[in-house]
């Protein structure tokens, strides 16, 4: 399957002309052979000093299929044990990469891609995406989720110039990784609702065509969950296609708004380990658990609006003590304050918010019920409860605050 990126780079009904940086997207068996051909005699032959970034698990799984590519590149294999997209991993790459690198190949899943795109951005070199699992939607985005000085941030980075997703590789990834990809997509229900509410309340820029793209990704996966979980190659390709569509939606907007909202903020809090210890869970697993928690809270708010129990009041920074208690003990308080400036809530009057309540209720009512979402995730083998990711029940309330 070849995805024509030009289909997404055109004048849009939202009034903007979306920019797409990726030149080629290939999702099929033998895609890495096409990559090797392009590096040898095609559009990538101009790059003469390429760096592959992968981890120990990925190297072992791809060594045979990608032997010719590895032979022509500097290959940097990071220890998969405890690997995070953080300053430590970035320093390892920077300290070991050759000075004349002119192309980076990210061979792996989400963590490897975040590290690679961040390095590519900082060193102003292009990168190629070689996804090895359909585990998330970050392969073609222009942002990276990086932990810097203890704070999980979404930082500007670069999109790949090409994607070579080889079905012979990613369809054979552990089912847990595939389930994590389904989890990441199912959370888009929350993301799109958040974006619609922000547009309603603050007038934030909103693109209906991008929303349709995310909805197409959701529909693609929902209709094929059973076959995807059974490892059917054609359906795994559809999952990868849906994840790349979601990433293209972010690339079109220029940030993560269409695909990362309240549920991702909750997971970033967990990643910072200020209200919990280390979690042995994949990003997608944390996202599906957070999405269910947020969905339950949203449905509770919608019910309160319906019953006339929800009213707007002037914004007051009532959580200062909670912030101090949560982030102060790790010396992160000032950095967190900077991340959240300016405080948007200060600009929203209670009168305006009160007028928006019915619209907010309507948007939330469009979301699937908690039971429907739970069953979808259960069918796909996704994480659903805090216990599934090793989180204590006591962390739920501060996570939502």
Please state what every model-predicted region is:
Residues 1-103:
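ATP/NTP phosphate-donor binding region
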Residues 53-54, 108, 165:
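Short beta-strand/turn micro-motifs composed of small residues
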Residues 215-303:
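A conserved active-site cap/scaffold subdomain adjacent to cofactor or substrate pockets
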Residues 107, 136-140, 281, 285:
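Active-site histidine-anchored catalytic micro-motif
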């Amino acid at each position: 399957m070849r995805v024509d990126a030009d289909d997404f780079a055109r004048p849009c009904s939202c009034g903007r002309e979306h920019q797409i940086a990726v030149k080629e997207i290939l999702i099929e068996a033998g895609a890495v052979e096409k990559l090797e051909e392009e590096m040898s005699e095609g559009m990538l032959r101009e790059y003469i000093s390429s760096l592959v970034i992968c981890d120990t698990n990925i190297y072992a799984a791809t060594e045979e299929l990608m032997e010719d590519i590895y032979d022509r590149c500097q290959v940097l294999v990071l220890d998969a044990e405890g690997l995070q997209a953080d300053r430590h991993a970035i320093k390892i790459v920077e300290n070991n990469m050759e000075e004349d690198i002119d192309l980076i190949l990210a061979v792996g899943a989400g963590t490897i891609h975040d590290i690679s795109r961040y390095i590519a951005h900082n060193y102003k070199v292009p990168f190629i995406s070689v996804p090895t699992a359909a585990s998330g939607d970050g392969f073609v985005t222009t942002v990276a989720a990086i932990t810097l000085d203890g704070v999980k941030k979404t930082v500007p980075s670069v999109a790949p110039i090409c994607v070579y997703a080889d079905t012979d590789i990613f369809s054979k990834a552990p089912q847990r990784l595939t389930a994590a990809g389904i989890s990441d997509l199912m959370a888009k229900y929350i993301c799109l609702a958040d974006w619609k509410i922000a547009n309603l309340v603050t007038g934030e820029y909103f693109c209906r065509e991008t929303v349709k793209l995310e909805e197409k990704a959701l529909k693609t996966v929902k209709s094929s969950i059973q076959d995807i979980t059974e490892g059917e190659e054609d359906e795994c390709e559809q999952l990868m296609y849906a994840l790349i569509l979601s990433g293209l939606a972010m690339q079109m907007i220029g940030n993560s708004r269409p695909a990362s909202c309240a549920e991702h903020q909750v997971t970033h809090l967990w990643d910072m380990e200020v209200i919990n210890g280390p979690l042995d869970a994949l990003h997608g697993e944390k996202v599906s658990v957070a999405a269910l928690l947020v969905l339950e809270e949203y449905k509770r708010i919608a019910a309160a609006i319906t019953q006339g129990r929800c009213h707007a009041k002037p914004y007051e920074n009532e959580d200062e003590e909670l912030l101090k208690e949560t982030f102060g003990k790790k010396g992160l308080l000032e950095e967190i304050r900077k991340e959240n400036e300016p405080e948007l809530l200060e600009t929203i009057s209670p009168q305006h918010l009160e007028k928006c309540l019915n619209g907010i209720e309507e948007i939330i009512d469009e979301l699937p019920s908690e039971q429907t979402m739970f069953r979808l995730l259960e069918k796909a083998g996704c994480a659903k409860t805090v216990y599934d990711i090793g989180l204590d029940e006591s962390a739920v309330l501060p996570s939502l605050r």
